[in-house]
């Protein structure tokens, strides 16, 4: 069989479809991002995703199963020990999990913070605890403006987040201290991501995070993107993809300010007509709505993405394949503010794909990476079981 010319892989960040068997171990029993959201609001009609088979994967009020899905469809488990962006995306490109990324539920050790301050030339930091990003700038933003000390916080994920005022502290200075933190937080600390979280405003009533977030990830081992690039193909990264992989295996990268901007950038990448992989992350579902438990905001974002799908599909050539998937769950109806341990959907569509094929429940997100490798005719990483033969015409 001839190789596919292009794969357009869109990660709709945090769109889970039901609790995994071990969800209770993570405090996530009964989580179902799409199912619970649809039920709570009395329906969530996603006709275009439904036509691809989304409603066949879990009960979504308003998006029923269809008898003849237009694409191949299935669900994937997260094999790795985690439920965060890094874990999901790294597994998806065939990176076999080693030790889990470390989390710091009690904040970071004092000696580590002291070394960070020494290297970064800081008198001190504020916070150093688990917190919501929007709440901690309300709590500590005014003190940050008085002292000039950045706000350090973490979450249930393996993240070292640094919030600072974009104008008073300075965006480039914020990026500089985050690069210093990234260098410090390598193994044995093994923090997955250092995240710069700039904000603006004058007091706690109007502090607002800006779109100039920047992620600094651990350096990944060899993975799918390297294989695609080394085969002479393009890897066009949209959104935070380049940050997640520290730029490895990427030939072109563009950051985005919103889902709508991300969809526009996907169109621009499609218009480039370069053979290879377009790899996009649309983060608003997770960042703006999942963590904030905003059911209506999340639902609106899903409706907008569903409405945008036909125009993307219309730009697919006869040798192109569209893949829609997610990296973890983040049920906006659930208690707390953290990600949820869920299965994620995988929907594949295009002229090379057999319609109506149920690929079942995959043991790992790496199965998708192995499948993309086979479709593009590049070597697999050795982690993940390809289902390309099931779905290719």
Curated annotation (Swiss-Prot):
UniProt KW Isomerase keyword: yes
Subcellular location per the Swiss-Prot or TrEMBL entry: Cytoplasm
Name this protein carries in UniProt: Phosphopentomutase
Matching NCBIfam families: deoB, PRK05362.1
Domain of life: Bacteria
Pfam families referenced in this protein's UniProt entry, alphabetically: Metalloenzyme
Source organism: Symbiobacterium thermophilum (strain DSM 24528 / JCM 14929 / IAM 14863 / T)
One GO MF term attached to the UniProt entry: magnesium ion binding
Catalyzed reactions: 2-deoxy-alpha-D-ribose 1-phosphate = 2-deoxy-D-ribose 5-phosphate; alpha-D-ribose 1-phosphate = D-ribose 5-phosphate
Binding residue positions for Mn(2+) 2: 286, 291, 339
Note on cofactor: Binds 2 manganese ions.
GO biological process: 2-deoxyribose 1-phosphate catabolic process; 5-phosphoribose 1-diphosphate biosynthetic process; metabolic compound salvage; nucleotide metabolic process
Family recorded in the similarity comment: Belongs to the phosphopentomutase family.
InterPro entries: Alkaline_phosphatase_core_sf (IPR017850), DeoB (IPR010045), Metalloenzyme (IPR006124), Phosphopentomutase_DeoB_cap_sf (IPR024052)
CDD domains: PPM
Taxon lineage: Bacteria, Bacillati, Bacillota, Clostridia, Eubacteriales
Binding site for Mn(2+) 1: 13, 327-328
Membrane-spanning ranges: none
Principal location listed in the UniProt entry: cytoplasm
EC number(s) from the headed UniProt entry: 5.4.2.7
Function comment: Isomerase that catalyzes the conversion of deoxy-ribose 1-phosphate (dRib-1-P) and ribose 1-phosphate (Rib-1-P) to deoxy-ribose 5-phosphate (dRib-5-P) and ribose 5-phosphate (Rib-5-P), respectively.
Essential cofactor(s): Mn(2+)
GO CC list: cytosol
Pathway(s) per entry: Carbohydrate degradation; 2-deoxy-D-ribose 1-phosphate degradation; D-glyceraldehyde 3-phosphate and acetaldehyde from 2-deoxy-alpha-D-ribose 1-phosphate: step 1/2
Top-level EC class as recorded in UniProt: isomerase
Keyword field: Cytoplasm, Isomerase, Manganese, Metal-binding
